[in-house]
């Protein structure tokens, strides 16, 4: 069972308690600290849309500590980041792996950050299939199509060629925060605000 802390704020009208994530949302901070699933993606997308409706001119700060997860759920978050008017600053804390790294790279240019000891990992998508040969072929073709789409987007986000991305994601490719800057996944490493 996970524990969510509450914070209490006082003002002239009295006290109010918030779960920590709701309180962070007031400061335009969204936190993804789990696997990318349909449920977690829907929460992130809803928060982004809410913050855009509140003030489309202010940045959203998207903190990522995720092992990755579902490609389709990740695309829902990524597409929303590109769709909304707000700049989305991405910040890696801990690890951004797989779809987590993909989302990290999708932040607004110049606003993709990582803390000094963060790790970033990119690789090709994986999946499995059962059934008749025809079904297996359909799934395999879809995985290849998805891989090409991911590679094209990562190439655009990093300044690398699609061929370089394809080669570099053949197997798990771990990077330090500084290596991720050199690779073009992020723009800088930050130690203090």
UniProtKB/Swiss-Prot annotation:
Q: Which GO CC terms are listed, alphabetically?
A: cytoplasm; endopeptidase Clp complex
Keywords tagged on the record:
Cytoplasm, Hydrolase, Protease, Serine protease
**What Enzyme Commission number(s) appear in the record?**
3.4.21.92
Q: Which Pfam families does this chain map to?
A: CLP_protease
- UniProt keyword annotation of Glycosyltransferase present: no
**Example GO BP:** protein quality control for misfolded or incompletely synthesized proteins
Localization annotation: Cytoplasm
What are the positions of the active site?
Answer: 98 (nucleophile), 123
Under Gene3D superfamilies, the record lists: 2-enoyl-CoA Hydratase, Chain A, domain 1 (3.90.226.10)
Reactions catalysed, as given in the entry? Hydrolysis of proteins to small peptides in the presence of ATP and magnesium. alpha-casein is the usual test substrate. In the absence of ATP, only oligopeptides shorter than five residues are hydrolyzed (such as succinyl-Leu-Tyr-|-NHMec, and Leu-Tyr-Leu-|-Tyr-Trp, in which cleavage of the -Tyr-|-Leu- and -Tyr-|-Trp bonds also occurs)
| Similarity comment | Belongs to the peptidase S14 family.
Q: How does it assemble?
A: Fourteen ClpP subunits assemble into 2 heptameric rings which stack back to back to give a disk-like structure with a central cavity, resembling the structure of eukaryotic proteasomes.
Put simply, this protein is called ATP-dependent Clp protease proteolytic subunit
According to its UniProt entry, this protein's organism is Lachnospira eligens (strain ATCC 27750 / DSM 3376 / VPI C15-48 / C15-B4)
Task: Provide the organism lineage as a comma list.
Answer: Bacteria, Bacillati, Bacillota, Clostridia, Lachnospirales
